[in-house]
Amino acid sequence: MFLLLALLTELGRLQAHEGSEGIFLHVTVPRKIKSNDSEVSERKMIYIITIDGQPYTLHLGKQSFLPQNFLVYTYNETGSLHSVSPYFMMHCHYQGYAAEFPNSFVTLSICSGLRGFLQFENISYGIEPVESSARFEHIIYQMKNNDPNVSILAVNYSHIWQKDQPYKVPLNSQIKNLSKLLPQYLEIYIIVEKALYDYMGSEMMAVTQKIVQVIGLVNTMFTQFKLTVILSSLELWSNENQISTSGDADDILQRFLAWKRDYLILRPHDIAYLLVYRKHPKYVGATFPGTVCNKSYDAGIAMYPDAIGLEGFSVIIAQLLGLNVGLTYDDITQCFCLRATCIMNHEAVSASGRKIFSNCSMHDYRYFVSKFETKCLQKLSNLQPLHQNQPVCGNGILESNEECDCGNKNECQFKKCCDYNTCKLKGSVKCGSGPCCTSKCELSIAGTPCRKSIDPECDFTEYCNGTSSNCVPDTYALNGRLCKLGTAYCYNGQCQTTDNQCAKIFGKGAQGAPFACFKEVNSLHERSENCGFKNSQPLPCERKDVLCGKLACVQPHKNANKSDAQSTVYSYIQDHVCVSIATGSSMRSDGTDNAYVADGTMCGPEMYCVNKTCRKVHLMGYNCNATTKCKGKGICNNFGNCQCFPGHRPPDCKFQFGSPGGSIDDGNFQKSGDFYTEKGYNTHWNNWFILSFCIFLPFFIVFTTVIFKRNEISKSCNRENAEYNRNSSVVSESDDVGH
């Protein structure tokens, strides 16, 4: 009787707070399979549950997406901000699969019972503990999301983004040119507004548990990209909203952007999302695509419709974050997912079962992180997340106490080198993962390229150093170095010119516009023509900054129809047809707005653009004098060291015959005695050559001298013989005359 009452209570709670999630109930008592190894038991767990009498074996590994400084912020009735650290939640989260369905996804919290999601091929289940149960009973329910019949994004956001990256399946040659995925980390700050707080239970720990559960599932989805979605902190507007949440998502987004600039500046995050409950919204999301590293647009709105549950809401957030990191929605005729629903498919929100990113999404993401700067996703050392102290084997990230980490069973390409279950090397092999590990489980020889240059003047190729399976950090020309024959500057590894920027937007032949165009479009106080925003209001540029505001281009007439009329602005100025685009209509993959001139673009003698202002180059850290430090035989790199020209050796670029140049940072050199020599350059044979040359040079000189003397003697003898013959001839003639 007590169990029935508990089940009815749990059923009522699910109906009240889980939206349209199905109530197809099963009761199960999970059974944990114990391990003799306590260390392995903490990182990996096995549970057996039953659904409809069928046993399922869940293999789980530790999932880390909450940092040690994770806080939950709330406001009291007087408006004061308070924070709580739910430290007990840090070690609860696991992800894995059901052995009976190897392609399944399982995401669970194991503290105070099992709570989370089980996604099989075409069906999803939720599992939660029965409160006050003495027998560890849990309920399992089939999760169903009714079609919310709403768009994910407003037309003015999604349409403009999609026109910049049309649907197409990339050629294999294009994919091969993109670099391999490296571990990255996206730090997200979540805010829950009052209506959603009430809808999810109106209690701090209950709401926190649900949001952590949602982000845990989102993080599981993004592991395909080796991208860890870290929930930096959670803010609950439990008493009243700090901004108005009326209107559509894009209206709320503008208000939220202005609010976060003032109130979230000291709280670490790469992007912030406001979660809003709306019973029947027109669309359920608003964000700026490709802006994850842009502090002016690093925000989004996700609406929770009444028609979906936590799983569907997780997909909404995953799709929005996907747009932030360069993804587009899938064309179902050209993009596919093997035995799963594609996450960037519009129907994924209402679909049940396993969800993964498509081949198109994979290409979009690889392009995003390969071709442009995404440094905000690489600052793991500043986050100090949980998995830094507690490594997770199988996530493809080499962490403390791991000898190798080649990913999970399906991802690992070094199975004969690395045990993907324990992250230990097999036998006496040298390595088991990383770009500088060979298929023979050996470290790549020093001097093997591991990261190609993306700019011939401003970026440098990196090499394996022969002692590590990882590639050395990226090296490029120090910001402020002249490039393109002195008409541009290097900035973050790229030669920044308005011609290149215009060509990327409007096609081949487009160029930076004359000064008159820049002056015109950056002096008007309008939304499409400005030098940035303040309190959500557009600002005209100061005269000194007009070359650093909106990007103005001129394009050939044959390309004039290639741009989207809804986002392109045409101006006729002094016999020039100037072209620009609306702010927010197109984003660079480094997170900056294509509408503006890129940072590092020259705006005057010894000046370049930074954050829409024209600044002197020497004020921006150009503290390495290549003329003195590198003796004029190299340039300064981003580590403040010399990148020497061929024929000169680092660190000070002294002349050395045969040296390929380079720096002490690019992985191609090691210190040997009092000078640097290139690894991979065969110094052994070089020394033998010099020694042999010194030994045989005297013999060569003697031999040459002997040959020379011999020739001289031979010539002298020949002259004497010729003279003798001539004299003999004269004597003979005289005798003939006498007779």
Curated annotation (Swiss-Prot):
Transmembrane residue ranges: 688-708
Keyword Nucleotide-binding appears in the UniProt entry: no
Expressed in which tissues: Expressed specifically in testis.
PTM comment text: The prodomain and the metalloprotease-like domain are cleaved during the epididymal maturation of the spermatozoa.
Spans within the Cytoplasmic topological domain: 709-739
Source domain of life: Eukaryota
Domain Disintegrin: 390-479
Function comment: Sperm surface membrane protein that may be involved in spermatogenesis and fertilization. This is a non catalytic metalloprotease-like protein.
Name of the molecule in the record: Disintegrin and metalloproteinase domain-containing protein 18
